[in-house]
Amino acid sequence: AMSMLADRFPSRQLGFAAGFYYMGVPIGVAASLLIAGYLGPAIGWRACFYLLGGIGLLLAVGLLFLGETPRKGVDAAQPEKLKFREIIKILRSSLTQSPALMCTIAGGVAFHFILGAAAFDQLWFVNERGFERAEIARHSGWLAAAGGILGNLLGGWLGDKWQQNFKTGRPMFLFWTSLLLSPFAVAYRLVPADNILFDLGIFLGFVQLGLFYGPTFSTVQELVPPRIRATVVAFYILSLNLIGLGIGITGGGILADYMTAQGHGEPYTVTLLVFTVLSMLAIPLMYVAGKRFHADRARLFGSGAPME
């Protein structure tokens, strides 16, 4: 689905389109928290899962009525049929010849370390910050909705504007926003729940999550040949989930259990701080990706690279 956006939108609007598409993430996260917070005490957690799954199935039915979009840069009359081995060869070539693409993907994976570890956020809220489960689910749900939607819209739109008006690509926009927001990501893990930095940190965390999607997914799509765009986007999503989230949630669980066994008073605080810092590896990677973007795109498409 994500790769279809490059066929429907020009390059100058691709970041906003990707950010708008990925508003589904904060909306979904917020909806799950709000349903758990408001309905969980009444209907139980199993019924909440069934309700959320049913909503997803109903929305998926609408895809049956969505028409296909002609592929840009691909001959619709004579579509090219690539063997799996050829696709892998082109994918490997695209990665090795484009530092911007490699750094964008690696930066996205690093950014997802904390998203995986954030699976323990609700335990942290309850066990180490003294919240009641339903109360914090409702509270964080509203913050997730507001921050996530704002971040997605701003990230896509401002990322597009950045690339149009500066000599660097959209990842450089993420470099600067990450530098600005990272101190808040650390600070709110250290303060008590009644400190203003606590709610602000949760809100800005979801803003930062929203800022990520538009610039990175549009960058990945612009740095690969159209004929394997869907494959590369799929590889990127696989990397984010299998490596980024996988390391975050598995490593986070191991570290939290270890800290608990050692008798540490706040094992989840330490765990989440460690993975917050690890996720900051994305910052220098986005800097390199932003600096290299235009040169790598020109190499891919030639000096007359289309920048619609």
Map each language-model feature to its residues:
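Extracytoplasmic gate region of multi-pass secondary transporters
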Residues: 99-153, 209-213, 217, 245-252
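Cytoplasmic helix-loop-helix junction between adjacent transmembrane helices
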Residues: 1-25
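Cytoplasmic membrane-interface "Motif A"-like loop-to-helix N-cap segments
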Residues: 161-177
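Helix-loop-helix hairpin linking two adjacent transmembrane segments in secondary transporters
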Residues: 21-68
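Intracellular juxtamembrane helix-capping segments at the cytosolic ends
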Residues: 1-9, 211-224
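Juxtamembrane intracellular "pre-TM" segments in multi-pass secondary transporters
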Residues: 71-103, 128
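A membrane-interface helix-boundary motif in multi-pass transporters
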Residues: 41-53, 169-172, 256-279
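Multi-pass alpha-helical transporter architecture, strongest
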Residues: 62-65, 184-190, 273-306
